[in-house]
Amino acid sequence: MSKPRKQQKCKTCGHTQFDVNRYTAAGDVSCLRCGTVLEENPIVSEVQFGESSSGAAMVQGAMVGADQARATFAGGRQNAMESREQTLSNGKRKIKRIAAALKIPDYIAEAAGEWFRLALTLNFVQGRRSNNVLATCLYVACRKERTHHMLIDFSSRLQISVYSLGATFLKMVKALHITSLPLADPSLFIQHFVEKLDFKDKATKVAKDAVKLAHRMAADWIHEGRRPAGIAGACVLLAARMNNFRRSHAEIVAVSHVGEETLQRRLNEFKKTKAGTLSVKSFREVENLESSNPPSFEKNRAMELKISKKLQQQQTDNFEDLSKMTEEEKQSVFGKLSKEEAQKQLLMNTILSDITITTENLNDQMDRILKMKKSSLENSLYKTPYELALANGSEQDPSKIWNINKPKNLVANLPKTDDILQNVSSEVELNSDDDDEIVLESKLTEEEVAIKERIWTGLNHDYLVEQEKKRLKQEADELTGNTSKSSSGNRRKRNKSSLPAELRKELGDIDLDEDGTPRSAADSAKMYISKTSVSKKINYDSLKGLLGGNMGF
C-alpha cells in the first residue's frame, strides 16, 4: 500500500488551500489566506500529450541527452539531428555492416559502437579516415572478448593498409587510455586456421595438438616478442604433420598471413628445444617437461663462444709465429716496446697459448712484476727535502734545508726580452713547411699544373679574348695618337663640402700651422664647417658673433 502524499502548506501562515493563476502563462501559485506566492513559473516534469492539426497524438516537449548541446525539435526539419549524432549513427551502422561481413557477434559490435562514441567524444575521429577508426574500434572490442580476429582480417575486408590500421590502433590505445587490453593468445587463432584448412573429422584432434604445441612454445620462451599468428601457423603445421596431413608452407602462409621465412624460423626455434627432440607419442604423453632457454639467449651465447674461440685461435697462432721467429725478428716486432713491456707481452702470449707452465716459473714472474711496480711507485712518490735528508742519515734543521732549496737570483738569471727576440726571425719563411708530408702531398706536379692551367683557360676563354681585344685597341690608339682624356678626368670633381659658394667665400682662407693644424679657434670652426654639410639646426647668425666676428661671415 502506497503512502499518502504529504499535503503542501503555506510557509507563512500554514494554510493548505492555494490558488493557481491559469489566466497567465506564468501559472503562479499563491495562498488563499495571506496571498503569499509559493511558486513562480513552475516546471512540470510529467509527460504531456497533445493533438496535432491532423488529430494525431504527439508528445509535448523534447528529450535532451547527456552528450547533446541542445534539444532537437521537429520544426522546419523533421527528425532534425546534430552533426555529432549523425556521425555517431553512421558509424554504428557501418560497424554493424563490418561485423556482419566478418561474422562478429552483435554484442561485440555494440561494444565497438561505444568505443566509437568515446573516440568521438575525445575528438579522435578528426583528421582520420572513418574506416580506420571503425575497424580499430571493432578490433579493440574483439581483443577484449578474446576472439580470433586479426588486424589483417579487417585490412583485407576494407581494402586498407594493415600498417595504417596498426598505427591508428596504437594511437587510439594511447589516446583513450586503454590499459587493460589483453595480449593476443596464439591458441585463439588455431581453431580459426584449422577450420580454413579443412581437416574433416580430425579437425578437433589437430586443434588439440596445436594448442598443446602453443603452450609448449610459450613455456620455452618462443611466444615472447613474436607475432601470435606466426606461432599459431607453426603449431598448426606441426599438428597436421603429427596427424599425417600433408600441408605445405604456402597453405599455412595463405591462412595465417605471415611470411614463409617467419614460419620456418619458428619451426627452427622449436627444433632446438628439448620438446623438439621428442617423438610424437612421447610429446603427447609427457606433461611436465623442463623449459629451455630463450632463442635470443642461445643465439647470443653461440656468438660469444664463436668469438672467444676465434680470439683464442688467433692468440695461439701469434704465439706459434713468435716461437718460430729469430731474435732479430722479435726485436723488430717488439722494437717499439720497452724491455718490461716486451717481457710482459711474451709472458701473456705464453699463458694464452695453453702451454704447460710450472708453478715456480709463474711465481717468479709474478714476483718480478710486483717488485718492478713497487720500485716504480716508490720512485714516483714525492718526498720533501727533510724526508730526503732523513733517508740519507743526516738530521739537520728543517729551516736550513728549505733555505738551501730556495731559489736564489731567480729574476737576475732570467733571459731578457731582447735576447729572446733576437732568436726570432722577423722575415716570413715561406718554405718552412716544405718538408711536411701533408704539404708535399698537396703540391702539384708540373703535369698537373699544366692540366689545371688548360682547364682554367678553357673556362675563361671569352674573358681572356675580350681583355686581349681591349689591350690591342689601346696600343693601336697610342700609335695613331688618337688618345683622349678619360671621362672621369673631364668630370667636375664633387666638392666634399655641401656649403653654398657664397658661404664658402665669406669664410675666407683658413690659417694653418706647419703641421696642418688651425692656429685659432675661429680657423678650427672654419675647417669644421667647410668639411661638413650645412645643418639646418645651426644658427649661423649667432655663430658669427660667437667669436667676435672673426669668422669672416
UniProtKB/Swiss-Prot annotation:
Renumbered ranges of Sequence repeats: 98-174, 193-272
Gene this protein is translated from: TDS4
Cellular location(s): Nucleus
Gene Ontology MF terms in the entry: RNA polymerase III core binding; RNA polymerase III general transcription initiation factor activity; RNA polymerase III type 3 promoter sequence-specific DNA binding; TBP-class protein binding; TFIIIC-class transcription factor complex binding; zinc ion binding
SMART domains, alphabetized: CYCLIN
Protein name as it appears in the record: Transcription factor IIIB 70 kDa subunit
Record-level GO cellular component terms: nucleus; transcription factor TFIIIB complex; transcription preinitiation complex
Residue span of region Interaction with TBP: 281-553
GO annotation, biological process: DNA-templated transcription initiation; DNA-templated transcription open complex formation; regulation of transcription by RNA polymerase III; RNA polymerase III preinitiation complex assembly; transcription by RNA polymerase III; transcription initiation at RNA polymerase III promoter
Span list, region Interaction with TBP and with the Pol III subunit C34: 98-272
Subunit field text: TFIIIB comprises the TATA-binding protein (TBP), the B-related factor (BRF) and a 70 kDa polypeptide.
Organism: Candida albicans (strain SC5314 / ATCC MYA-2876)
Role this protein plays: General activator of RNA polymerase III transcription. Interacts with TBP. Binds to Pol III subunit C34 and to the TAU135 component of TFIIIC.
Keywords: Activator, Metal-binding, Nucleus, Repeat, Transcription, Transcription regulation, Zinc, Zinc-finger
Entry's family note: Belongs to the TFIIB family.
Gene3D superfamilies in the cross-refs: 2.20.25.10, Cyclin-like, Single helix bin
